[in-house]
Regions:
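Phosphate-binding/switch loop-helix module in NTP-utilizing enzymes
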Residues: 90-158
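Loop/turn-to-beta-strand initiation segments
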Residues: 52, 78-80, 131-134, 164-174
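Conserved beta-strand segments of the P-loop GTPase G domain that flank and frequently precede/overlap
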Residues: 25-30, 55-57, 82-84, 136, ...
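Short acidic, S/G/P-rich loop/turn micro-motifs used as interaction or catalytic elements
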Residues: 31-35, 61-62, 88-89, 141-149, ...
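Substrate-engagement module of ASCE P-loop NTPases
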Residues: 147, 151-179
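Glycine-rich P-loop/Walker A and Walker A-like loops and their local beta1-loop-alpha1 context
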Residues: 2-68
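Phosphate-binding/switch region of NTP-binding enzymes
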Residues: 168-228
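P-loop NTPase catalytic phosphate-binding loop
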Residues: 63-106, 110
């Protein structure tokens, strides 16, 4: 990561605030930048803050992110991967990382319960929410390709409620407000903070909700940096 990428990371981490408090944080990110922001978040949370976390791959098989992390010298050792897409896509390549699989993106409602069961029954296995400090999903919006909106909304509510039961778990949720306004508004109602990655960075309260609101410069920091 170059200096511009680090500046972006620092801006986002500043917006997240006290990560020990956990909770769901909404990030308004252009869909073309999901991979870049994922890498920056994983660098900041996993390496800089040494937080063990879970990365849930919905958009692409988990091996893709493992490859990008290693290519950009971001150590995936503290990460556990939950792969939602590989069994559906038929990708069977090994990524040499801790990984658990669920039965495809059409069964998204089963994911929160699967995480609960894994955490309750496995002390030192692939997934243990009790040892997790954050959970990041690569592309929430892509779930709408495989499920109707009501199922995705139910998943999102159940997912955040599950994380609330593990009070210290942070959940950054990346959604493109312009492309998925309905999902964005649903997520906004469930989150404790909103980070809008457009225009100039400034800290102001949201007019409607009064929740903390952060604007980050429109990816000028990452131009010429990480290539997703």
């Amino acid at each position: 990561m170059n200096e511009k990428d680090v500046r972006l990371m620092n801006s986002i981490m500043s917006g997240l605030g006290d990560t020990t408090q956990g909770g769901a944080v909404l990030l308004d990110v252009k869909s073309t930048q999901f991979v870049r922001v994922s890498l920056v978040l994983l660098r900041g949370l996993s390496e800089e803050l040494q937080m063990p976390g879970i990365f849930i791959s919905v958009d692409r098989p988990y091996q893709y992110m493992v490859h990008l992390l290693r290519m950009h010298q971001i150590n995936p050792a503290k990460l556990t991967f939950i792969d939602v897409i590989s069994r559906f896509s038929g990708d069977r390549k090994e990524g040499n990382a801790n990984v658990g699989f669920v039965d495809g993106p059409f069964h998204v409602n089963s994911l929160p319960e699967a995480l609960r069961q894994w955490s309750a029954t496995i002390d030192n296995g692939v997934v243990n929410l009790k040892n997790c400090r954050f959970v990041l999903i690569d592309n929430l919006t892509s779930l709408l390709t495989y499920n109707n909106y009501s199922h995705v909304e139910l998943f999102l509510r159940d997912f955040i409620e599950m994380l609330k039961s593990n009070a210290n778990v942070l959940a950054p949720l990346m959604i493109d407000q312009e492309r998925s306004p309905l999902l964005y508004e649903t997520a906004k109602s469930l989150c404790t903070k909103e980070i809008v990655m457009k225009e100039e960075m400034r800290q102001v309260p949201t007019a409607a909700s009064g929740k903390p609101y952060l604007k980050v410069a429109d990816f000028r920091y990452v131009q010429g940096g990480i290539q997703g």
